Amino acid sequence: MDSFRPHLAKVAGGLALDRAEARAAFDDLLSGEVTPVQAGAFLTALKVRGESVEEIVGAAEAMRARMTRVAAPENAVDVVGTGGDHSGSVNVSTLAAIVVAACGVPVAKHGNRAATSRSGAADVLAALGVRLGLDPAAQARCLDEAGLCFLFAQAHHPAMRHVAAVRSELPVRTIFNLLGPLSNPAGVGYQLFGVAQAALAEPLTRVLAELGSRRVWTVHGSDGLDEITVTGPTQVVALDEGRLCHFTIDPREFGLALRAPEELRGGDPADNARSLEAVLAGARNAYRDIAVLNAGAALVVAGAAQALADGVAQAQDAVDSGAARATLARLVRASNDHSNGQEGR
């Protein structure tokens, strides 16, 4: 494709694209007109040099322009991560999203099937009975009736099919592993955003600021988790209406004991679904602790809690009262009621 060649030449020469150039390059990639050789060379060159903030912003703009959007309340929040931590943990952000919704904050949870783990958000939700791949109208109804919807990435980003084969053949993660979490189909302005590499925390927070996010906590656990961890401290880069700050979260400050990494180990989707249901039924374990800590943070990000201690307390109450369990039941019911024969589990 002639329009793509200058962008490929620039990146292959070790130079960075500006925002407009990056958007144009990714417009071409997502159109399906770029050859597999060109796409592979471009993505690999970006990976080797390291993507700049402007390149990621431009790429995300191209991705967002092609996504299938879902209507959501202005205060909707997402709890999402880049993945790639290879921890094999339980589904933390999925349970945290359910708890946040039970606290009265609308959650548009964006996610996909597992890539580097045994159980992604889509996998565990399907095992719990949630219908996947709903159309935007059905998703909006789930959000209205359950306070929560699951935005199945492959259903909302059809243009990704044009780079799927190239990505599967490359031996490294590419910029597209970042673009999915940055491209919530509901256009949420509030995110609890996990990264598996500490070096990505500030750049991706700046990307989200450029893309219009209002309040974000980008988190990286000391154990490598793309979550707020309970095995040690977590580094946070926070965005609040254009201003960035850095701080550390220690779970012990919120009455949560430090846990061993093995206590967060998950299994296949069925195993993780049973673990999630056990927490909602009252189990007190490491999974509950990490879920309420992350849910509490999301409540602060969404403006529903003034401080993390308050957010954690709200999250604990939502679990203990049965509200979180009822929220999951409503999501299962709503997603099946409004599926209209769309993709199953």
Swiss-Prot record:
Pathway-wise, it operates in: Amino-acid biosynthesis; L-tryptophan biosynthesis; L-tryptophan from chorismate: step 2/5
Reactions it catalyzes: N-(5-phospho-beta-D-ribosyl)anthranilate + diphosphate = 5-phospho-alpha-D-ribose 1-diphosphate + anthranilate
Q: Which GO terms describe its molecular function?
A: anthranilate phosphoribosyltransferase activity; magnesium ion binding
The record's cofactor note says: Binds 2 magnesium ions per monomer.
Give a yes or no for keyword Chaperone in this entry: no
Q: Which cofactor does it need?
A: Mg(2+)
Keyword set for this entry?
Answer: Amino-acid biosynthesis, Aromatic amino acid biosynthesis, Glycosyltransferase, Magnesium, Metal-binding, Transferase, Tryptophan biosynthesis
Q: Which GO terms describe its cellular component?
A: cytosol
State where Mg(2+) 2 binds: 226-227
The biological processes this protein is annotated with in GO are: L-tryptophan biosynthetic process
State which Enzyme Commission number(s) the record gives. 2.4.2.18
* Amino acids binding anthranilate 2: 167
Task of the protein:
Catalyzes the transfer of the phosphoribosyl group of 5-phosphorylribose-1-pyrophosphate (PRPP) to anthranilate to yield N-(5'-phosphoribosyl)-anthranilate (PRA).
The family database entries (PANTHER family) matched by this protein are listed as: ANTHRANILATE PHOSPHORIBOSYLTRANSFERASE (PTHR43285:SF2)
Tell me how this protein assembles.
Answer: Homodimer.
Q: Which family does it belong to?
A: Belongs to the anthranilate phosphoribosyltransferase family.
Q: Which NCBIfam families match?
A: trpD
* Listed name of the protein: Anthranilate phosphoribosyltransferase
Whose protein is this, by species? Methylobacterium radiotolerans (strain ATCC 27329 / DSM 1819 / JCM 2831 / NBRC 15690 / NCIMB 10815 / 0-1)
Q: What is the lineage of its organism?
A: Bacteria, Pseudomonadati, Pseudomonadota, Alphaproteobacteria, Hyphomicrobiales
Q: Which gene encodes it?
A: trpD
